[in-house]
UniProtKB/Swiss-Prot annotation:
Contains an active site 4-methylidene-imidazol-5-one (MIO), which is formed autocatalytically by cyclization and dehydration of residues Ala-Ser-Gly. InterPro entries: Aromatic_Lyase, Fumarase/histidase_N, HutH, L-Aspartase-like, Phe/His_NH3-lyase_AS. One of its GO terms (cellular component) is cytoplasm. It comes from Burkholderia ambifaria (strain MC40-6). The gene is hutH. It is an enzyme of class 4 (lyase). This is Histidine ammonia-lyase. GO terms for biological process: L-histidine catabolic process to glutamate and formamide; L-histidine catabolic process to glutamate and formate.
């Protein structure tokens, strides 16, 4: 059970919500603020004075006054008309994060929503009744309206859900959770819809995957150093301390740790080779830069996870209603775009190491890592697959945040595209997973070919894991299943665990 303290969520909590079957409860310390916000909205609605989002229309229709007897209909219509998402359902892990983030934002007491509505969301979450939310349809301002409308529609008994993974109607979902459809009161529909929770959830969910891939890439890169008979001298701490970047210093330390005591490395220490290619030698510089970007993105996303991104905002202590733009997800878009750059570079560097390993003139290994080359093609086309994926990632890494299209009759004339920025991270991560799987296979093959010498004590278990699932490549065979099984292990963090390094979300 995780206790949500609004405004004080942590990265480890968010990773657990996404990855583990934890349940949620709301910190009772938040109840007074929630109730005060709801009372403030009720008082404003009772007075009848115009207040945006409470008794007016929305967007370009904000100047239209809504009579008191139509306020509930206004909120219902808002939810139903905004539930216009398209595409595949959002991943279960992202929906869980989205719901938790929405609860945290509402729980800070500046949205004017009743606890009854929040309790219904928690009940659905804990019953494993998750809204079916189409993943496409948000421009990241005014908030993630369409995705959050699909979440909110379920509370009204409209739309679809997944009940313990099985697709069903919203009414069936409410029934399983022991709930009845809600009638939303003044401002409640808007409070549910306005916010950056979809883009932030997608960015966090994919960031956790990219963190796992980063650790895997450290391991794969170290194994490739041994496979290519590369030097460990470029990882000397003194080199990296002179430059001073934290990520670079820590990445170099990880490579030193992983390669310490390698018999392969000791066997060629006195060779006449002066320098390795950049894909081996400059790993700390590249991976360190990726690490620094990822950490910055994590800092930004954690702030956003704890933010109130509603509009308008209720200040119960003064009774004021202030309209602003906290729903604009530009910080999330920038963070997601930075993550895309890092994830694409992780894959790009791994692809270059694969290319090095299969090139006999660079690696000193048999061409394409197979004996009897010619009749056997070995890793030739596996590298082509890695190249195709790395190239695709370069296109996907183009920043979404540089684009904007005006919406709502030019009332919302600049938008963030944060949801797309966050969503495409999943494709980049998936591509990078397969690139790393191919590298792990190629590096393991190269290490085998260095016999009688072996890799380091830290990397020996990695070799054992690979070889327990995929045999040494002797002759050409149907290769795709080999890549698939190692990619599955990459996704399960089987290799990430070997990295002497962890992110804040894992602590």
């Amino acid at each position: 059970m995780i206790t949500l303290t609004p405004g004080h969520l942590t990265l480890p909590q968010l990773r657990k919500i996404a990855r583990e079957p934890v349940q949620l409860t709301l910190d009772p310390a938040s109840f007074a603020k929630i109730d005060a916000g709801a009372k403030a909205v009720a008082d404003i609605a009772a007075k009848g004075e115009p207040a945006y989002g409470i008794n007016t229309g929305f967007g370009r229709l904000a100047s239209t006054h809504i009579p008191h007897d139509q306020l509930e209909l206004l909120q219902k219509n808002l939810v139903l008309s905004h539930a216009v998402g398209v595409g595949e359902p959002m991943a279960r892990s992202s929906v869980r994060l989205l719901m938790a983030l929405k609860l945290s934002s509402l729980g800070r007491g500046h949205s004017g929503i009743r606890r009854e509505v929040m309790d219904a969301l928690i009940t659905l979450f804990n019953a494993d009744v998750l809204p079916l939310i189409p993943v496409k349809g948000s421009v990241g301002a005014s908030g993630d309206l369409a995705p959050l409308a699909h979440m909110s529609a379920v509370l009204l008994g409209v739309g679809e859900v997944f009940i313990r993974g099985e697709r069903a109607s919203a009414l069936d979902g409410l029934r399983v959770a022991g709930l009845a459809p809600l009638t939303l009161q003044a401002k409640e529909g808007l409070a549910l819809l306005n916010g950056t929770q979809a883009s932030t959830a997608l960015a966090l969910d994919n960031m956790f995957s990219i963190e796992d891939l980063y650790r895997t890439a450290l391991v794969a890169g170290a194994l490739s150093v041994d496979a290519a008979a590369g030097s460990v001298k470029p990882f000397d701490a003194r080199i990296h301390e002179l430059r001073g970047h934290r990520g670079q210093i820590e990445a170099a330390a990880a490579y030193r740790d992983l390669l310490d005591g390698s018999p392969i490395n000791q066997s060629h220490r006195d060779c006449d080779k002066v320098q390795d290619p950049y894909s081996l030698r400059c790993q700390p510089q590249v991976m360190g830069a990726c690490l620094d970007q990822m950490r910055h993105a994590a800092d930004v996303l954690l702030i956003e996870a704890n933010a109130v991104s509603d509009n308008p905002l209720i200040f119960p202590d003064t009774g004021e209603v202030l309209s602003g733009g906290n729903f604009h997800a530009e910080p999330v878009a920038f963070a997601a775009d930075n993550l895309a750059l890092a994830a694409a570079e992780i894959g790009a560097l791994a692809e270059r190491r694969i290319a090095l390993l299969i090139d006999a003139t660079l690696s000193g290994l048999p061409p394409f890592l197979v004996k009897d080359g010619g009749v056997n093609s070995g890793f030739m086309i596996a590298h082509v697959t890695a190249a195709a994926l790395a190239s695709e990632n370069k296109t996907l890494a183009h920043p979404a945040s540089v684009d904007s299209l005006p919406t709502s009759a030019n009332q919302e004339d600049h938008v963030s595209m944060a949801t797309f920025a966050a969503r495409k991270l999943a494709d980049i991560a998936d591509n990078t997973k397969y690139i790393l799987a191919i590298e792990l296979l190629a590096a393991a093959q190269g290490v085998d070919l260095r016999a009688p010498y072996h890799t380091s004590p830290k990397l020996a278990p990695v070799m054992e894991t690979i070889r327990s699932h995929v045999a040494h490549y002797e002759l050409d065979h149907y290769f795709a299943p080999d890549i698939a099984v190692i990619a599955k292990l990459v996704g399960e963090r089987a290799f990430a665990k070997a990295a002497p390094f962890s992110f804040a979300s894992e602590q």
